[in-house]
Amino acid sequence: MSASLKNQQGFSLPEVMLAMVLMVMIVTALSGFQRTLMNSLASRNQYQQLWRHGWQQTQLRAISPPANWQVNRMQTSQAGCVSISVTLVSPGGREGEMTRLHCPNRQ
């Protein structure tokens, strides 16, 4: 064997252990970030669903609510305008409230 091959060495045990610890810390941090990101996306999706169904329920002719959703719709009329208030509760327990005023076009 040549002298240069005899002098070459691999990584020492402390270097390998340090690299493994760093890798585990990075993977753990990334998995926590991914979990947080997924939870925030799920929350955003629930909020969008709540908004969309609330908007549909405040129409003059509301469509039937999705299964497992609780809807409380109240409609009042005054001075030719119709006010529709809706309280929604999603199957996941998220609650929302919306009020919309419908007035006819006067020309």
Curated annotation (Swiss-Prot):
Pfam families linked to this entry: N_methyl, T2SSppdC
Matches recorded under InterPro entries: N_methyl_site, PpdC-like_C
GO cellular component, one term: membrane
Cleaved propeptide residues: 1-10
Record's protein name: Prepilin peptidase-dependent protein C
N-methylphenylalanine modifications at: F11
Function: Not yet known.
Annotated TM spans: 11-30
Mode of membrane association: Single-pass membrane protein
Cellular compartments annotated: Membrane
